[in-house]
Amino acid sequence: MSPKERIIMGVDPGTILMGYGMLHVAGNTPRLMAMGVIRLEKFDNHYIRLKRIFDRITGLIDEFLPDEMAIEAPFFGKNVQSMLKLGRAQGVAMAAALARDIPITEYAPMRIKQAITGNGNASKEQVAGMLQRYLRIPDEQMLPEMDATDGLAAAVCHFFQTSGPMARSGGSAVKNWKDFVNRNPDKVR
């Protein structure tokens, strides 16, 4: 790969379905490499799901060799247990990237939607449709699970935030555990 080429892995954390997308960037031209979902519904035990997330994210990293990871931040809901589980799933995906020294940038869901559609309150369908048009994804490659396009959206958002003359200062890249702990003392003890 030339110095101006990179691969961005996007992740939409989840405890039932976790979406991912791989984006190859050459210069200022992004191209879809892959997108999909990690299915976790068949595992009753939450800890087994976390292990599966780690194993699958690590496998995807080993297969596609991404240079960077963009991950959607958990949204704040009313159900504390759901938030805890989602945060754990996100943390395990981040740990897999950090174990391979892949820098991570986290983006809020509204920021991703804003970057893709121009509307921070866009629906999942609107995000998927815009990604399909922008990346020229054939209908047969689109998946019924919107988690896959949500993962891809994180990667495309990161591309927009870091590439070309329109790049704006965006999320904060975390290069290793020490960096993460220093930036987030309230999240660790």
Curated annotation (Swiss-Prot):
GO BP term, example: DNA recombination
Catalytic activity, reaction form: Endonucleolytic cleavage at a junction such as a reciprocal single-stranded crossover between two homologous DNA duplexes (Holliday junction)
Keywords carried by this UniProt record: Cytoplasm, DNA damage, DNA recombination, DNA repair, DNA-binding, Endonuclease, Hydrolase, Magnesium, Metal-binding, Nuclease
Subcellular location: Cytoplasm
CDD domains found in the cross-reference section: RuvC
Superkingdom assignment: Bacteria
Binding site for Mg(2+) 1: 12, 147
UniProt cofactor(s): Mg(2+)
Binding site for Mg(2+) 2: 72
GO molecular function terms listed in the Swiss-Prot or TrEMBL record: crossover junction DNA endonuclease activity; DNA binding; magnesium ion binding
EC number: 3.1.21.10
Listed PROSITE patterns: RUVC
Predominant localisation class: cytoplasm
One matching Pfam family: RuvC
UniProt xrefs under InterPro entries: RNaseH-like_sf (IPR012337), RNaseH_sf (IPR036397), X-over_junc_endoDNase_Mg_BS (IPR020563), X-over_junc_endoDNase_RuvC (IPR002176)
Gene Ontology cellular component annotations, sorted alphabetically: cytoplasm; Holliday junction resolvase complex
Comment on bound cofactor: Binds 2 Mg(2+) ion per subunit.
Residues of the active site: 12, 72, 147
Primary role: The RuvA-RuvB-RuvC complex processes Holliday junction (HJ) DNA during genetic recombination and DNA repair. Endonuclease that resolves HJ intermediates. Cleaves cruciform DNA by making single-stranded nicks across the HJ at symmetrical positions within the homologous arms, yielding a 5'-phosphate and a 3'-hydroxyl group; requires a central core of homology in the junction. The consensus cleavage sequence is 5'-(A/T)TT(C/G)-3'. Cleavage occurs on the 3'-side of the TT dinucleotide at the point of strand exchange.
PANTHER family: CROSSOVER JUNCTION ENDODEOXYRIBONUCLEASE RUVC (PTHR30194:SF3)
HAMAP family, per database record: RuvC
Family: Belongs to the RuvC family.
UniProt xrefs under NCBIfam families: ruvC
Subunit annotation: Homodimer which binds Holliday junction (HJ) DNA. The HJ becomes 2-fold symmetrical on binding to RuvC with unstacked arms; it has a different conformation from HJ DNA in complex with RuvA. In the full resolvosome a probable DNA-RuvA(4)-RuvB(12)-RuvC(2) complex forms which resolves the HJ.
Protein name per its UniProtKB record: Crossover junction endodeoxyribonuclease RuvC
